[in-house]
Amino acid sequence: AASDVYKRQGVVAFELSTGDIHIFESRAVTFATGGFGRIFKVSSNAHSLTGDGPGILYQKGIPLEDMEFYQFHPTGIYRLGILLSEAARGEGGILRNKDGERFMERYAPSIKDLAPRDMVSRAIATEISQGNGAGPDSDYVYLDLTHLGAETIKKKLPDITDFVRTYVKIEPINEPIPVQPTA
């Protein structure tokens, strides 16, 4: 048909620095629009990462792929989106639910708290959804470092100690730290 003669596939781009318009023809286009971590309640992502790109594409009927593969860091400081290094678990930190139970033994019996991020994040989410979360809203668990001793915590985990003292007003040598999976 005559209308097919004018059909093109690809991308039309506007170059901001010059005002030039460029046409890139292709059989397929992949949109890599940046992050969307701010769609989650607690995130360490920049405030600009709101998912505008995927949202626009979805509204236009363009299929989105692998959206379920968003990585969560298991030990973000509760409500703040500040990530605590996995070194805390590497040094022997233990995740505990509201009852003080070391729950990772049920989810990863051989590696417990050293399980990969995705396993630990899912385990925390499961504990919370089953009513085992701590706090008035039962929406976090604890990262317990108290058994490591003051010297180990000060020497090997100084950043964690500083973050927690500054932002949560908790002394991690004496009290467990409230944490939750963070986008």
Q: What kind of feature is each model-predicted range?
A:
Residues 14-16, 96:
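A generic structural motif
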Residues 39-56, 60:
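A conserved FAD-binding loop/helix module that cradles the flavin
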Residues 19-28:
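Core beta-strand elements of the Rossmann-like FAD/NAD(P) dinucleotide-binding domain
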Residues 56, 62-179:
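An anion/pyrophosphate-binding glycine-rich loop and adjacent beta-alpha core
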Residues 1-6:
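Short, small-residue-biased leader/transition segments that mark boundaries at the very start
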Residues 28, 32-37:
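Glycine-/small-residue-rich beta->alpha transition segments that form the dinucleotide
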Residues 19, 36-38, 71:
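Glycine-rich nucleotide phosphate-binding loop and flanking beta-alpha elements
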